[in-house]
């Protein structure tokens, strides 16, 4: 079994409730879960666990178990099971199922003691009805010598005469019994025909009157099963799953909270109204508690809607998850809300118990009680992979297990799928299947809400049939919306044409409703400029011959179905626009209707265009050279700036050093003092003064030279450190970019940008180089940046034309201008 095919694996539905008296089974559907034959655990392997011992044997009345070892001629010598024989001699078991054709039943019997007693009673009654057979068998099985010594020839004659008389009586009784059975079968056939005419074929009519809520469920007592399916409060209000006898019992048990409510209390931001209200509430508390105490004896504390499943082993987890997510949780939460508001489940529980007290039949409960009807409709719809439209306390709850009929890639030839499925890689978010990734589901939902107005709706059935199936009045807004839909118009255009009658939000709601109910699917608006091809998933081996006659009857003036497909997908030519196969303008409407019919039944898909940005090797080399030239120019500019700053710093430091030296100040002061003293004292001191001046001037010169040399050394060291740091930073950036360029050049001849909307720095340089090389105009540059993030091979250009309101002519000009730098692919 493939996940592409619907397989609910739903066996039955149980509704378990728990009161202060204990858990009990309130309702089950189907009613004949006991008589259904499934591959249960063999009896010889059963009872190995302590919790399953009572399913095979009962500790009470162990003496009656000796009857199991009584030998009967009707027992199978290998298995020991009691067999019956039809008129043709074929064996059957006690429920009328052929043992040879149903080996599971004979080899996998897993019954209770009550069923064994019933089997023995039926066998005993059969032996009493035909005593001659068993007497004859007993006599024939005795020892021949003992018969010869104990009986003579006369006794043998009497036995033969007695056997002959008994055979005659048996033949008469057999004829009468066959006549009665024939009459009963005729009556049953008449009842079945009446039931089929009424549309109720869910229950076999041979045992309608014998169904009881106390019947065993797959060999288990209802009381024992209810104990398992009634978990404590700590395990309620969450997913509950238990496996018993290869059957999975799945549900969401709802338990009453300690404060008596069923739903979680919502946080309220209202301010308290004052002490008076609180005092009034305190006064009412005692009386309310007294009323609750008086009614809790028979009140409902827990209810559990249980879905019994038997999925394949390879799909067990997948089928259980989808059943819980789409059906079990939605239905249980709807019941919880109804119970919280109007005590819906509690009232239905009392009504069902009252009906059973009045000896109402189990098959008649769903005709008068809404809860029983809800469970029945849910089972009949979900088990047949249909949508369940349930009514819970006057409110509609819609449940369905999503069916995968939309594929974004072609399945393997060995993988089965639903006939008339279609391929579409652009609108996969409109499908409702297997979105286990929550984040992806949120993104898909956002995309759906934003983009659905850009698509058109293709109805999957005739409009009047949809109105009839969904019980919609033709004159209602929804009915008018369905009648006015056309697959060649997007919902945006539909809103603009019918703005007086429909709001955009209303149109979006109607569209989502039709998609959910599988009455329509979202497609690209049909256009004569688009290209359509035959679908590789077309059901050419199953439905082709039927559809050929249907297509010819529907469109008598159009080519036949095979010829139409041949025109769309010629064998030796590339597919052309749809306008090329329309003979004239008068045939336009009929050809569009035929195209819509072919798309609806999965014969045709639209061919879409996807684009990637391609960066050739020469453009990457050019960008690399430009980056190297920019780095070299930046380095020269930095060296020039640092050189000018170093020269200015050297001259200033020398002057400042000479002026601010403390030794220089001391020497100058001493020299001036001595000169003035010599002038005052006379000529005797002239020789000394000249000597002092010469000595002081030499010292001043040597001091200035030392200071200048020290300052120049400090400036040179600072300049070298700055230049080295800047050079290292520039070299690290250059090396990093060179590594990226080397990888891109070496890896491939051409590079494709996968996500242009999140391009790196280097990829942006490539994109800017494309714009400069192609010499795009300002208008084309604006269109280019508008479409840039969609050039990822995931979004078709046909969709961008509608969403971004770009004309086909402008798009054609842009693609022609950048044709050397794009890779285009055409597929579904």
Swiss-Prot record:
Residues 49-59, 139-151, 169-203 have a biased composition (Basic and acidic residues). InterPro entries: HTH_NPRL3, Npr3. GO terms for cellular component: GATOR1 complex. The keyword Signal applies. Residues 60-79 have a biased composition (Acidic residues). Residues 645-668, 675-684 have a biased composition (Polar residues). The keyword Signal applies. Residues 1-21 form the signal peptide. It holds the Pfam family NPR3. Mediates inactivation of the TORC1 complex in response to amino acid starvation. Required for meiotic nuclear division. This is Nitrogen permease regulator 3. It comes from Lodderomyces elongisporus (strain ATCC 11503 / CBS 2605 / JCM 1781 / NBRC 1676 / NRRL YB-4239) (Yeast). The lineage of its organism: Eukaryota, Fungi, Dikarya, Ascomycota, Saccharomycotina. The gene is NPR3.
